[in-house]
């Protein structure tokens, strides 16, 4: 399915939102994250839309943390691992279709909606396993391969780090491409596209309905996919500055510098969202948009409805209006 061209109504100004909304696709659903709340909407096996929401931990999303460059980049890791895994576990529960009344209780103020606990020990265990897997595959493995090659080729800071970065990039692209061949993951990628398109519609002050959401592309410059690609690029530069010490020191440095790299990547992502028309930032975000061709699919109408339901729940919790803002006229 191909996205139609965007047609902007002339009588609606761009929404000057104070919040940069983000999100993540889950199993048959979408998680949306705002300034103080997160919301999840999932298409249940009976075709109803199930939604839930919870406040964000303000020690991470508010106060001084969000004002410190580099340090606030850690919230992106929390998004991808902490919040994302909670939302994923919630969506998996819904798909199991064996919920009891004690586990799922209808909400009084939402259409087919539930309030469920998003905090489970299993989620944290899964986060830990995911972190170990990610660090092992995408940081330690490329270094181990380069370290093995250095037994036959003299070590050189430039080529060693370039080779390590190239291997890391190949692993990343190969991973997202291969899992994208799985039917279930294809649907997750379609919900990923629906998430982006809904955010586009909100940011362009269009009504949140499938007719308007469908006009937008499934790629978005603030996507976490772009974040991952920036992590790879920044790691090449940063690790090159460290030279080629003993292999165990390099492995330790890769692990310890992950928060620093994430912080730098997050700042670039913020700049890309703040200055989308800047020629320099267009060059910076372009590779991430290209990579999203692998991690997004154009959704069908039912998938857009789920993304819209998630955004509407979030806007309600954030005290924002889901309706387009109307341009004021001088008297």
What spans do the regions from the language model cover?
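Short, charged, low-complexity patches
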Residues: 63-74, 78, 257, 261, ...
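Hydrophobic alpha-helical membrane-embedded segments
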Residues: 36-37, 68-90, 164-189, 261-274
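Polar-ligand-bearing catalytic/cofactor-coordination segments
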Residues: 2-26, 30-32, 46, 58, ...
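Membrane interface segments of multi-pass transport proteins and intramembrane proteases
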Residues: 111-116, 146-163, 242-252, 271-282, ...
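Juxtamembrane "helix exit" motif at the C-terminal ends of alpha-helical transmembrane segments
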Residues: 90-94, 130-155, 231-255, 259-262, ...
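Divalent-cation
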Residues: 1-109
């Amino acid at each position: 399915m191909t996205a139609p061209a965007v047609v902007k109504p002339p009588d609606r100004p761009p929404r000057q939102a104070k919040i940069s909304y983000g999100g993540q696709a889950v199993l048959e659903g979408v998680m949306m994250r705002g300034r103080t709340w997160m919301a999840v909407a999932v298409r249940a096996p009976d075709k109803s839309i199930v939604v839930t929401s919870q406040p964000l931990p303000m020690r991470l999303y508010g106060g001084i943390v969000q004002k410190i460059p580099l340090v606030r980049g850690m919230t992106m890791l929390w998004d991808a691992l902490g919040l994302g895994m909670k939302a994923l576990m919630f969506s998996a529960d819904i798909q199991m279709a064996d919920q009891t009344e004690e586990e799922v209780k209808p909400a009084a103020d939402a259409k087919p909606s539930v309030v469920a606990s998003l905090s489970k020990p299993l989620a944290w265990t899964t986060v830990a396993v995911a972190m170990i897997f990610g660090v092992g595959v995408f940081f330690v493995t490329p270094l181990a391969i380069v370290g093995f090659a250095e037994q036959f080729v003299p070590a050189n800071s430039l080529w060693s780090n370039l080779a390590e970065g190239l291997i890391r990039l190949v692993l990343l692209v190969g991973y997202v491409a291969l899992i994208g061949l799985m039917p279930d993951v294809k649907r997750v990628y379609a919900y990923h596209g629906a998430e982006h398109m809904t955010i586009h519609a909100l940011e362009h002050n269009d009504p949140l309905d499938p007719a308007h959401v469908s006009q937008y592309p499934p790629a978005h410059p603030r996507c976490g996919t772009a974040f991952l690609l920036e992590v790879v690029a920044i790691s090449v530069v940063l690790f090159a500055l460290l030279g080629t010490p003993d292999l165990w020191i390099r492995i330790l440095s890769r692990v310890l510098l992950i928060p620093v790299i994430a912080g730098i990547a997050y700042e670039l992502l913020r700049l890309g969202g703040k200055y989308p028309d800047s020629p320099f930032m267009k060059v910076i975000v372009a590779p991430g948009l290209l990579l999203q061709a692998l991690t997004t699919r154009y959704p069908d109408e039912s998938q857009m409805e789920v993304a819209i339901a998630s955004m509407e729940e979030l806007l309600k919790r954030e005290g924002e209006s889901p309706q387009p803002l109307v341009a004021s006229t001088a008297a």
